Structure formats: structure tokens, C-alpha cells
A protein has these predicted regions:
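A short acidic, Gly/Pro-enriched loop at the edge of an enzyme's catalytic core
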Residues: 99-111
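Class I SAM-dependent methyltransferase Rossmann-like catalytic core
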Residues: 5-22
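A short glycine-rich, Lys/Arg-flanked "PGG" loop and its adjoining helix->strand segment in the class I
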Residues: 124-138
Length: 243
């Protein structure tokens, strides 16, 4: 079984491909200071199977949403959900690389991205995605961050798997350095990790052993041993008027 097929099997029947929950997504959305009946244009980057996309569509009922991902498998899953919820007239999917957004400047009122910025790196994402934001538009990103001084185990694991992991303070400094107005942040609750890993472990038990599975199991082990060290953190910011 090659890596893409193994990946799909590992996440079979899971609405989320990383730690998170509807409650956390809605909390992040609540920081966005637009009326929920506004006619907005929204970009959901790294949408996966569409958990955040559908919540955005339900909250901003008069808005248009573009949901992009690199994997057509998950876009097909989301397309089915869009049809089932009669959202075809305002929610659209597109296979697109987040490193090369094919949109005009100042196109979106909101850019939303859960646990995806790490793919290109947080600093690069802040710089690149600002281009497509309208003035006074919101960028909401969840990003892996240190919550306290990490143990040797968690530091070794994450410096290997995501070298840009850093403290909340340093992430906020990057946001300000890029010229955004920093609004707020909040830390994902441990229950979001626990539920995600429980579902993932259940799927992994049905799959053959290989390096891919070994890496997943190591990630789970590191979290169980060091859950106070790190978490995903939602960062909420605005593109200031003069940019």
C-alpha cells in the first residue's frame, strides 16, 4: 500500500485530518467581527473533508466560500457534503496548491486555515496569504506552538517534523512583523487532541505495519507523554487598511 492510499485508510471516516473540533472552529469564527448575514467572500485553505468549510457556510449564511485542497479525494468528499446540504450555489471546491493561490489581489474578506499553514511554513503563509485578503480582512490560522518549555522528547520530535514550531510569543511577533493587526489567540483544548488520536488509533489498528504507521504511533506517544508542552493555537489577525 503506497503512502497516499495508506493516508486515506488511516483517516477513514474521520471528519478532521488533525486535532480540532466544531466547538473550537466556532470559537475561532466568533472572533471575526463581521455580521453573520453579511455577503462576504471566504477562502478556506487546506479544507480537507470540509469540517471548517461547512461551519463557515452555516455561520455566514449569505457568503460565498472557496474551499481549496491539494488532494482530490477529500474535495470529492466535500463536494458530496455540499450537495447534501444544498450549498452548491455558494460553496465551491478547487484543487489548488496553497503555495500558489490563483486569485486576484484583495479578493477575500476572510482567509481561514486550520492546521495547514505548516505545509508551507507559518511565516511564509502569513506573507503569501495576505495578498489575497481585502483591507480589514481577517486571517484565522491554527498553528502548532510551544505552550511551555518543551521536554527533550517533544523538542526532538517536533524539531524534526516541523522546524518552525515556536512559542506563542514568537508567533505573535511574526504576525506583527508582517504588518497584521493582531487580534487574539486561544489554545486548542486537550480534548481535541484526545478525540482525534483515539479515532486515528482505531483506524491504525486495522492497517499493516510500516514506517508511515510507526511515525503516526510515535506522534501519539510523544503527545501522551508531553501534552502540556505544545498544542495547536488559533491566531486571529486583520490586514490593516494601509496595506
Amino acid at each position: 500500500m503506497d503512502i497516499p492510499l495508506y493516508f486515506y485508510a488511516a483517516f477513514k471516516d474521520m471528519d478532521r485530518l488533525a486535532p480540532g473540533s466544531d466547538k473550537s472552529t466556532l470559537k475561532a469564527i466568533d472572533y471575526i467581527d463581521f455580521n453573520n448575514d453579511s455577503q462576504l467572500t471566504i477562502l478556506d485553505i487546506g479544507c480537507g473533508a470540509g469540517a471548517s468549510t461547512l461551519l463557515l457556510a452555516d455561520y455566514f449564511k449569505n457568503s460565498t466560500i472557496e474551499a481549496i485542497d491539494l488532494f482530490p479525494h477529500y474535495l470529492k468528499v466535500l463536494d458530496e457534503k455540499i450537495a447534501d446540504n444544498d450549498l452548491d450555489n455558494r460553496v465551491y471546491t478547487c484543487q489548488m496548491d496553497m503555495n500558489d493561490l490563483d486569485y486576484p489581489n484583495c479578493e477575500f474578506d476572510i482567509v481561514f486555515s486550520e492546521v495547514s499553514a505548516y505545509i508551507m511554513g507559518f511565516a511564509k503563509a502569513l506573507k503569501s496569504w495576505k495578498r489575497v485578503l481585502k483591507q480589514n480582512g481577517y486571517l484565522v490560522v491554527s498553528e502548532l506552538s510551544w505552550i511551555q518549555k518543551p521536554s527533550k522528547e517533544s523538542k526532538k520530535f517536533w524539531k524534526t517534523h516541523y522546524s518552525e514550531i515556536d512559542t506563542i510569543e514568537n508567533k505573535i511577533a511574526l504576525i506583527k512583523d508582517e504588518g497584521y493587526e493582531f487580534i487574539d489567540y486561544f489554545i486548542l483544548p486537550k480534548s481535541d487532541f484526545e478525540d482525534y488520536y483515539a479515532n486515528l488509533e482505531s483506524n491504525l489498528r486495522t492497517l499493516d505495519d510500516n514506517d508511515f504507521k510507526k511515525d503516526f504511533k510515535k506522534e501519539i506517544e510523544v503527545y501522551e507523554n508531553n501534552s502540556d508542552d505544545y498544542s495547536y493555537v488559533y491566531y486571529i489577525m486583520k490586514k490593516e487598511v494601509y496595506q
